[in-house]
């Protein structure tokens, strides 16, 4: 508590009491006069403590690849109070400054900042070249490396190949993007695999602190191995992107009489067409299960075509010859009764029955 003193006017008694005024009514010395009390208020103290705690618990995160997806994630990371530094092949200094991040055009300068976490937001195709040329020796040996690629076995293998053994590895996949997650991340899947996290309590806590960012945003947190992720993703994400691009090539357009199902198709095209073909190619090239899914899609499409044309062929035969359209088995039996050509399976069955009777 601070005491401020200032001169004060002497206390003047009424005229009839001035002579007999007691000594205790005399004004205090000017040097001891209290003018104001400057004390910190409770809410100011709590705000200060909260600010200091937030700074102490903040992570310094280096984002490699500050393109569309990197900027999308960075806005949320900064909103959670973390310190962001970025690097990319292109100059994104203006974009970084606009959200409160710092941009470094040289990866050596970025590593000199000693980030707690290095977050790879590069494309699938450029990931290996980025890791191969990255100056790991300038980082602390306990640095946590995180990727957000749409395939998981591929970056896991690259991390193990190129990263020093002292570094921690966390493979993640936020299964949403700037379009599907532009309003909220609530309920959207976030898949992660703690590939290599040190036993030290500080390293365990750092990993959990990073994951809590997405948990606090309401993401559906799914811990899953990289191998299992790629198996499921080939049947969901790759198929989704494939159908979206097929419908885009087909040219679906909105109409005045859209059904709910058709609106879903339009949304699918919108969500997938905004992603680069490089991403789609990466989903195909670097997921070992993607080719099988593409072949299954092709077989399913051919099966539907055959079913449609088969039904059309039956209707055509009915119009041409009249009467009930017979199934293939009934047709074979009719040919037998009419003395037509006998199928080979019927010949073999009849011969076997005759031999048994003899």
Curated annotation (Swiss-Prot):
The protein's annotated pathway: Amino-acid biosynthesis; L-tyrosine biosynthesis; L-tyrosine from L-arogenate (NADP(+) route): step 1/1
A Pfam match? PDH_N
Query: Which InterPro entries does the record associate with it?
Result: 6-PGluconate_DH-like_C_sf, Arogenate_DH_2, NAD(P)-bd_dom_sf, PDH_N, Prephen_DH, TYRAAT1/2
Q: Where found? A: Plastid, Chloroplast
Output the Gene Ontology terms for molecular function. Answer: arogenate dehydrogenase (NADP+) activity; NAD+ binding; prephenate dehydrogenase (NAD+) activity; prephenate dehydrogenase (NADP+) activity
- Start-end of Low complexity biased regions: 348-358
Q: Which domain of life is it from?
A: Eukaryota
Q: Which UniProt keywords apply?
A: Amino-acid biosynthesis, Aromatic amino acid biosynthesis, Chloroplast, NADP, Oxidoreductase, Plastid, Transit peptide, Tyrosine biosynthesis
Q: Where is the transit peptide?
A: 1-36
- E.C. number(s) listed in UniProt: 1.3.1.78
The record's listing under PROSITE patterns reads: PDH_ADH
Predominant cellular place of this UniProt entry's protein: plastid
Any single biological process term in GO: tyrosine biosynthetic process
Give the UniProt tissue specificity note. Expressed in roots, stems, leaves, flowers, siliques and seeds. More abundant in seeds.
Q: Where is this region: Disordered?
A: 336-358
Q: Spell out the note in the miscellaneous section.
A: Unlike TYRAAT1, TYRAAT2 is composed of a single catalytically active domain.
Q: What is this protein called?
A: Arogenate dehydrogenase 2, chloroplastic
From the UniProt record, report the name of the gene that encodes this protein: TYRAAT2
